[in-house]
Amino acid sequence: MAHVRTFTLPHYEAYPVHVALFKDVKNPSYLKSQLLEANPAFDYAFLDAAMVARLGIAWWSHAAANDRPQILSPTHLLSTTFITIHALCTHRQKTRTPHSELVFRLSPNNNIGESYKKFGISDTTTHLIAVKLPLKSSDAEAKEWLVDGEITNESVSQHLGSVVEGTSVEISEKGEELGQWCDIDKIRKVYKLGDGSAKKGKKGAAVNGDGAEKEGEKKQMEVVILGTIALKS
């Protein structure tokens, strides 16, 4: 079984969000192929972990060249998940499924294909975030999304543990682990945040490379990114 952390979002307590984190993933091509084949058993948002920052959760108590993930922080991921669920519940979704909607909402542009290239699993992904939303369509046209009671922490844990060839990483209550492999430069590029050169010396090195400096940089980026995602919605 895989470690799965279940988060509850404000106002949408009926829709628990199940999240798993893996490192040293050895079968990304297989997982991606199942998504492309629309295998219902693999209905997840499989995200390359290089695009999330490690900041913790305050308000709810294409892989990088060096194989580092693109979710900036747990707040980055879960805020986007909140917007995704809200879009589905208010019939404002732009894509066909809850999980494709989540990937779409993470991206700053309106191209779903580009969203998957930037945030989705690729053939070279080694650090993986899997998100499972407990939603099912009431009809073929997906006019209404209902809670799927068969999706539980245990069911997600069992399935992911059997299909993902990698090391399951336990996620704490605050979810800081979700951003531990983020690629800051990749995230800056995707969200067009500049290169952060104001904080670097002549050789491109950070003037202050300590943890507080890095966390402060991530926090500033997070504010801009969340604003971008909110405006898109």
Swiss-Prot record:
Could you confirm whether the keyword Transferase appears in this record?
A: no
Q: Offer a single GO CC term for the protein.
A: EKC/KEOPS complex
Q: Which UniProt keywords apply?
A: Activator, Chromosome, Nucleus, Telomere, Transcription, Transcription regulation, tRNA processing
Cite the residue spans of the region called Disordered. Answer: 196-215
Give the record's GO biological process terms.
tRNA threonylcarbamoyladenosine modification
Q: Does the UniProt entry include the keyword Ligase?
A: no
- What is the role of the protein in this entry? Component of the EKC/KEOPS complex that is required for the formation of a threonylcarbamoyl group on adenosine at position 37 (t(6)A37) in tRNAs that read codons beginning with adenine. The complex is probably involved in the transfer of the threonylcarbamoyl moiety of threonylcarbamoyl-AMP (TC-AMP) to the N6 group of A37. CGI121 acts as an allosteric effector that regulates the t(6)A activity of the complex. The EKC/KEOPS complex also promotes both telomere uncapping and telomere elongation. The complex is required for efficient recruitment of transcriptional coactivators.
Q: How does it assemble?
A: Component of the EKC/KEOPS complex composed of at least BUD32, CGI121, GON7, KAE1 and PCC1; the whole complex dimerizes.
Q: What is this protein called?
A: EKC/KEOPS complex subunit CGI121
Question: Per the similarity annotation, which family is this?
Answer: Belongs to the CGI121/TPRKB family.
Cellular compartments annotated: Nucleus; Chromosome, Telomere
Question: Do you know which InterPro entries this protein is assigned to?
Answer: CGI121/TPRKB, CGI121/TPRKB_sf
Q: Name one Pfam family in it.
A: CGI-121
Q: Which domain of life is it from?
A: Eukaryota
